[in-house]
Amino acid sequence: MCRKSSTHPFNTYPMNSWKEYQTLHQERFLEELLELLRIPSVSARTENKPHMQTCAELVQKRLLEAGASRAEIFSTPGHPIVFAEKIIDPAKPTVLVYGHYDVQPADPLELWTTPPFEPSIRDGKIFARGACDDKGQFFMHVKALEIMTATGTLPVNIKFLIEGEEEVGSSHLADFVKSNKALLQADVILISDTSMLSMETPSIDVGVRGLSYIEVEVTGPNRDLHSGVYGGAVANPATLLAKMIASCHDENNHITLPGFYDDVLEASAGERTKMAGAPFDEAAYKKDLGIPALWGEKGFTTHERTGIRPTLEVNGIWGGYTGEGSKTVLPSKAFAKISCRLVPNQKSADITKKMIDYFQSMAPAGVTVTATEHHGGEPYLTPIDSHAYRSAAKAIAQTFGKEPIPVRGGGSIPICALFEKELGLKIVFMGFGLDSDNLHSPNEKYDLFNFYKGIETIPYFHLYFAEKS
């Protein structure tokens, strides 16, 4: 079921210059983005459902204002999906733009310099939850559509698929895609939800990692106990959970889960050579993160560890007393949330099962261990010999003045593999964020330079892609 919004005529601005139009209107572009960022569209929180609807409606409104001839909000059992399109000629190529308006929780709030949903501009950067992931990035495409429509230069048909559940695994997007294949018919999918190496060194992600995610619960006594009366006689769930987690890596930071690496498609020597040529300032990297040394799987560089290698990370661990001051208890339960980033040809379901089996097999006497599955997604690689990739590379070279370097992204976009399977479409990633933009962390940010440069670059992609015979 969907709710359709009436379209309105677009007043074409008498200007044939993309750059001139952008310069004239970029202050408004920014204000419209800030309005979007003020909406706390946190998909993981059920109490935020009204905000999700509000955000979807604003996205719909902006797409219509940008020149879309059709924009609809589709209801799902979860959060709404926004679809829009501008069809200029069915014979011309069609680009499907994917993005998401939902954001990660902002916790811990006390670590934000300014409130996460009260966006502020400091040092040429937008600080707000969702500034880069992904409101700031998908909104570049909305403004690029406006520029091309207003100047009468739109060279392709454009469709938009903007969802509200990416941060929780795109739970209902698969059903929508399967039920609306004709609606989503296109020639390529364009996504801006990834990063560049730096503002000085543009790059294009040629792949993203997959994801497996579980929650582990270790249960001991039927209540929290006095650590003096019972300590040493009763198994401590927190201590045992810590030991289990520590056993997941060996002394070389190699993951020890049986069969974990069985299906890993190793990167070619040629790809590793190209990655080695990408600039990397180790001192600046450590300074930005406030760490004294790098860490990771032995035998691989930082770029390789965060792109072509699978990982296992603890995302949260808790149990017992964690409030202010002290309380000497032996906790009844301990918990951990643990995720793995996956590389081709690992399968999310297989790795999830391996994680669950590993933790349950390690349950020592005195406690019980349960592990439950959360969302996941498959890894994805995109070809670099396609017309779409070359169009993206040419567009970035046009505006940045240098050729982009192909790299693999460390994050996950769970829906990518499904797009290719159900729609038969390849994906091109044109991300303009930076790894230092604090995605999923306090003080998320997005450089104004990147925001405006993205808006400037995207029309060139459409121009070059339209040259497809």
Please state what every model-predicted region is:
Residues 101-103, 161-169, 192-196, 220-222, ...:
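Acidic, glycine-rich active-site loops and adjacent beta-strand->loop/helix elements
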Residues 132, 222-224, 340-348, 377:
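A generic structural motif
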Residues 132-207, 469:
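Acidic/histidine-rich catalytic neighborhood of metal-dependent amide-processing enzymes
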Residues 14-109, 333, 350:
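N-terminal helical capping/dimerization or prosegment-like subdomains
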Residues 1-10:
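N-terminal amphipathic/hydrophobic targeting modules at extreme N-termini
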Residues 198-199, 256-333, 344-357, 362, ...:
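An extended, acidic, His-containing surface patch that forms the Zn2+-binding/catalytic region
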